[in-house]
Amino acid sequence: HPQDSVGYTNPSAQPYQYLNLYQTFRTRATVTSFRYTGYFQREYVWQRDSVEYTFNGGVRFNYWTLNNQLLISPRAMVSMLPNWKRNVMFRFASGVYYQPPFYKEFRDFNGNTNLNIKAQRSIHFILGGDYEFEAWGRPFKFIGELYYKYMDNVIPYEVDNVRIRYYGTNNAVAYATGIDLKVNGEFVEGTESWISVSVMQTKENLLDDAYYIYLNNEGDTIIPGYTVNNVPTDSIQVTPGWIPRPTDQRVNVGLYFSDYFPNNPNLKMHLTLFFGTGLPFGPPNNHERYKATLRMPPYRRVDIGFSYLLKDAKKEMKRKNVFGHFKNIWLQAQIFNLLQINNTISYLWVEDFTGRQYAVPNYLTSRQLNVKMTFEF
């Protein structure tokens, strides 16, 4: 039987039963358009009271003949470098950004093209800073940023397995806010390592997603496939409001650590760790974004790699030697997903004869070995 049913559709056991497609579309569209773009940018640097200031500003223009929309996007960044004993820099950036839609974004679920669609707009506010310091006699750098982004004319989309389907209309507003922190430096002398932590929240509000809950004469909510009495006698209108966007991954942690063998610095080890909280998901093919509030399991992954410098640019070789034409030659071996963790990428929804659906996870690649050689001229 097909993988999206639990046996009630089985052509081999029911040879005279027709298998009708659940949903079919046949469309044709021809789109011809032209884009005209341009930008202007200027930077100023000046000093006052032993503080160095930098201003970088510009504006970008975009005109698209498809919807006859002229977009003007100003943006600016100001940084301040005080004359302190510690090397610290502060910066603030803001701007208006537009994203004209691609073909898939102005094509709705039924294959119709919306030629009146507008570009999505985002207003950014970013406050950040850099701090360079020394620890254990070695250089390090700390980078931190706080940001808030407000978006309107948003084109919502839903994820069906690994397929992205857009609504084809500007019917939502959204926001994203969070903090990014990163430290990189020589945790081991002569090698670069880093650790990063990010916390983010992004939500959207569809302007036309109100729906009704239907009640039977016993006052119970009618749920097809679950309730016995499915005759509605009353209804309640529900406005979902703000819901998580498909990219709402609350916490992300990454670590990259490199080291080398004390007696052989040409032989190095690289260790990478990733952790991310679960992404939202919901039932498929219902075009009801407010139901996509379930969460996948967290993403966890550990990679390890070893690299050996076979040929060093510092060592001279005879030109007649075939390897003498290369500066460096590296041999690398990597093991991806070392702990063989099953990370969920999407869900396959299986339906039974009552209409109930069950989410079966699809997993990313398991443990994998990769070997490569790198030649540098």
Model features per residue range: what roles?
Residues 24-149:
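Structural signature of Gram-negative outer-membrane beta-barrels, strongest in the C-terminal barrel
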Residues 83, 118-189, 198, 204, ...:
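Membrane-embedded beta-barrel scaffold of Gram-negative outer-membrane proteins
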Residues 38-44, 76-80, 127-131, 179-185, ...:
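Residues on the lipid-exposed face of transmembrane beta-strands in outer-membrane beta-barrel proteins
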Residues 274-285, 308-377:
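C-terminal beta-signal and adjacent terminal beta-strands/loops
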Residues 48-49, 148-150, 170-283:
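Gram-negative outer-membrane beta-barrel transporters
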Residues 30-36, 70-72, 121-125, 173-177, ...:
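Residues that define the transmembrane beta-barrel architecture of outer-membrane proteins
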Residues 46-53, 82-88, 134-140, 189-190, ...:
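Short loop/turn motifs that connect adjacent beta-strands in outer-membrane beta-barrel proteins
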Residues 1, 57-61, 78, 92-96, ...:
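Transmembrane beta-barrel strands of outer-membrane/channel proteins
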